[in-house]
UniProtKB/Swiss-Prot annotation:
Descriptive protein name: Zinc finger protein WIP3
Main location: nucleus
Family of the protein in this entry: Belongs to the WIP C2H2-type zinc-finger protein family.
Molecular function per GO: DNA-binding transcription factor activity; zinc ion binding
Amino acid sequence: MNSYETKGLSFESPSFIEWLKPQSSTTSSKSVLYRGKTRDAISRSNHHQSQMNMLERSLFLYQPQEPLNTSIQCLPLLNKLMENNSQASDIKEENKDDVVTLQIGFPKYHRGSSEDGSDITFDHQKKPIKREIIEDGVVMMKKRRKMKFDEEIIDSDVEVCGKRFWIPSPAQIHVGPMQFACSICSKTFNRYNNMQMHMWGHGSEFRKGADSLKGTIQPAAILRLPCYCCAEGCKNNINHPRSKPLKDFRTLQTHYKRKHGSKPFSCGKCGKALAVKGDWRTHEKNCGKLWYCTCGSDFKHKRSLKDHIRSFGSGHSPHPSLLFDGFEEDTECVTTE
């Protein structure tokens, strides 16, 4: 016996083996009932929480809509501002009727009619352009923009961006800008002094001295102006993208005859047709003749041989026969006939 028993106290405790044994059925049933109650409480709380979430979602998604017929009412200050804006827009719409539309770019020109003889007008202004009539009857016209020229106004002298030029018609190119007619035989001349010299042949009464050959009407001023070609598609036409005017009227005449005119002159040796009489004479003079170099090359023109020698330098020189005759003095070249 231990000390507890000696003192009259007793404590019964289960042994270690009994403690290891499984509990009775009563305790197990109690634990099962407790677990079932906790599960029911948890399920009830979850169901209640889901109902609350559904209610919150419905309240959040529900937005009251106003009927379509309701009108928006602004504050008094906003009403005043809106009235002022409406008045300003009305004023602007009234002013729009008085605004003149402007055309940006180069103005276009077309043929018109007016009392003072000027027949060129703007498309958007319909105002005649002031034009000067010079003494020889050629109409002068001043403009500041690049224009498209019709066939009817090709014979006008124009000033564009400070540069004056002239576009003669085909008739003026063939016969000259003007003709002088003899009052007796009606023969025409391109130059006034030639007409006066012709008049001397009709009698001594027409011989008024050398001063009479100068004349009072000379188209010298316009003949010195740069000229554009009137032929369509020509590189010297004003409508060409890379157009470039010719030096003067005489140069234009030669250009037109060579490029766009007939070729009445033909070489008697090779039959080549030429338009300018001077070109025909030069061609017949040198046709069939060759200029030889010491390297064996031959050229149809003397200038071509000179260019060949200048380009290749040493080892190239004129043929000995040319040097013997004087190559630098425009001697006759070696013939192939």
